[in-house]
Amino acid sequence: MSPAFRAMDVEPRAKGVLLEPFVHQVGGHSCVLRFNETTLCKPLVPREHQFYETLPAEMRKFTPQYKGVVSVRFEEDEDRNLCLIAYPLKGDHGIVDIVDNSDCEPKSKLLRWTTNKKHHVLETEKTPKDWVRQHRKEEKMKSHKLEEEFEWLKKSEVLYYTVEKKGNISSQLKHYNPWSMKCHQQQLQRMKENAKHRNQYKFILLENLTSRYEVPCVLDLKMGTRQHGDDASEEKAANQIRKCQQSTSAVIGVRVCGMQVYQAGSGQLMFMNKYHGRKLSVQGFKEALFQFFHNGRYLRRELLGPVLKKLTELKAVLERQESYRFYSSSLLVIYDGKERPEVVLDSDAEDLEDLSEESADESAGAYAYKPIGASSVDVRMIDFAHTTCRLYGEDTVVHEGQDAGYIFGLQSLIDIVTEISEESGE
């Protein structure tokens, strides 16, 4: 058992873990919360849960590690602010949802509960029965304000935030990342609206892919030429088809769903949301990709080789997956935006690229290369709420062969990154 998991010993059921907004969420509509430094938490969708439980072994290094299931409810703190608190599931004897499937993560890697204060452990508090009645007027006003903020977010498709040189980047973004706060507030709103009928939800625990980076730069790409699942209503399917037709999804099988990148030249973080991503032309998509790998001073060329290597391997893996369809799934590309002295000069960057290729097999973690002198870079698939394959017995539609739309998007991505690499002089 790794030290990260060994630290989380069995905890009495009266304890809960305070869930916080995940400040590096740049896309998607599902609320992603921070469980602890290395673990995230998101609402359990049966289809996505089934995907992680039956995940093919060769795909594990391209997805976040699955860590189990918890029960989440909202409660008030001392200042009457609403908080989301996670608890172990009933009957799990302190361990977070043991899974018996042989294709899953080993039981030894599933999270256990602890009293360690740094994990934000709270005592259980009873939720006031009259909460809805007391706060109805107040919450109505907040809801109206929230709608105004979301409309502003749609209009402000690209935002900049100046990062202080001293201090932790995650703590600075805690109350700023617009997309993260939007998703968190929407989740609270949904749970509050159902307060009379339900105050207990299942969430899944997943690896925090950004935890190893000091200044995470994150690119969220919506993959494939089709986004709607087989179970989508006619209205939903038509809406998703329209979005694909009006974006780069229909042309190259991929579009920008969100971006967070550090501009070292100005000391700012740039955020790009999905509304801007939908408007990009193919050339605009290429420029956005170039911007993601550019730190405001120079192109991070030492990252391009490792990214291409990972994309090529992922493509080969998916070509072997029979009947899978990853509708509406995203692909994350992550690297550290922190400047490193040895990559300031172009000649140094070229040398580091050679080093990164030589040390590619010395990967740390699931699939994050950590070459000498260069930032590690990660490529992972996420969001499987609409994924299907013949293993899912309840599905009425069974597809044959590989997911051609997703693979087409991967090949387009490989081609564009290759173009950027060649045009930059490599």
Swiss-Prot record:
Q: Which GO terms describe its cellular component?
A: cell junction; cytoplasm; fibrillar center; nucleoplasm; nucleus
Q: Does the keyword Cytoplasm apply?
A: no
Single Gene Ontology MF annotation: inositol 5-diphosphate pentakisphosphate 5-kinase activity
What Gene3D superfamilies does the database record attribute to this sequence?
Answer: Inositol polyphosphate kinase (3.30.470.160)
Q: What superkingdom heads the lineage?
A: Eukaryota
* Pathway(s) served: Phospholipid metabolism; phosphatidylinositol metabolism
Would the keyword NAD be found if you checked this record's keyword annotation?
Answer: no
Going by the UniProt record, its keywords in alphabetical order are: ATP-binding, Kinase, Lipid metabolism, Nucleotide-binding, Nucleus, Phospholipid metabolism, Transferase
Where on this chain does ATP bind?
A: 207-209, 220, 383
Subcellular location field? Nucleus
The protein's name is Inositol hexakisphosphate kinase 2
What PANTHER family does the database record attribute to this sequence?
A: INOSITOL HEXAKISPHOSPHATE KINASE 2 (PTHR12400:SF47), INOSITOL POLYPHOSPHATE KINASE (PTHR12400)
GO biological processes: cellular response to flavonoid; inositol phosphate biosynthetic process; inositol phosphate metabolic process; negative regulation of cell growth; phosphatidylinositol phosphate biosynthetic process; positive regulation of apoptotic process; protein stabilization
Organism per entry? Homo sapiens (Human)
Binding positions (substrate): 222, 236-243, 386
**Main localization of the protein?**
nucleus
Q: From the UniProt record, list the reaction(s) this protein catalyses.
A: 1D-myo-inositol hexakisphosphate + ATP = 5-diphospho-1D-myo-inositol 1,2,3,4,6-pentakisphosphate + ADP
**Gene symbol of the encoding locus:** IP6K2
